[in-house]
């Protein structure tokens, strides 16, 4: 999973509402291996991370949805996919020169919110792994829903003399 996966799914500026884990019991101070982590967005879209013992094969789809599957090398099962892609509008141009964005005050392509949402995704998985259970998340408040133990992992006390 990476930034482009969320970009392709149109999920750059939001977070999943649920994270499910299939993993052995974790050490309380570290996250180890997992078999599967499933992130689900409010529209039902999922990102699945396969872990320990999973080996990607040629028949493993990179993206899978109700209309078909896309594999490595853009091989896919979606009928007439190239014609359908040609009908789509070009994406908005992105500002990829960071220094130019600083000078002109324009938004950088991979800005702080996208970076924050990337970190949130990873940290949601880490929290679910440490607690070894499904967690529900509110992408607006950016807190786990009805779960004090999970929320304590979001904002852990810092060791002295460190503070924010």
Task: Give each language-model segment a name.
Residues 1-3:
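Short, small-residue-biased leader/transition segments that mark boundaries at the very start
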Residues 8-9, 13-164:
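Glycine-enriched catalytic-core subsegment of oxygenase/oxidase enzymes
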């Amino acid at each position: 999973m990476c930034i482009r996966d969320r970009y392709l799914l149109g999920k750059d500026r939001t977070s999943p509402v649920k994270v499910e884990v299939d993993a052995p019991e974790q050490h309380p101070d570290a996250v180890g291996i997992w078999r599967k982590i499933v992130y689900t967005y409010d529209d039902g879209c999922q990102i699945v991370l396969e872990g320990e013992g999973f080996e990607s094969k040629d028949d493993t789809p990179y993206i899978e949805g109700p209309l078909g599957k896309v594999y490595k090398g853009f091989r896919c099962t979606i009928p007439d996919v190239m014609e359908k892609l040609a009908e789509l509008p070009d994406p908005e141009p992105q500002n990829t020169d960071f220094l130019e964005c600083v000078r002109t005050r324009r938004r950088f392509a991979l800005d702080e919110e996208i970076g924050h949402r990337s970190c949130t995704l990873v940290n949601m998985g880490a929290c679910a792994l440490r607690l070894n259970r499904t967690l529900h998340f509110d992408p607006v408040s950016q807190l786990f829903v009805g779960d004090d133990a999970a929320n304590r992992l979001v904002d852990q006390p810092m060791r002295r003399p460190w503070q924010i």
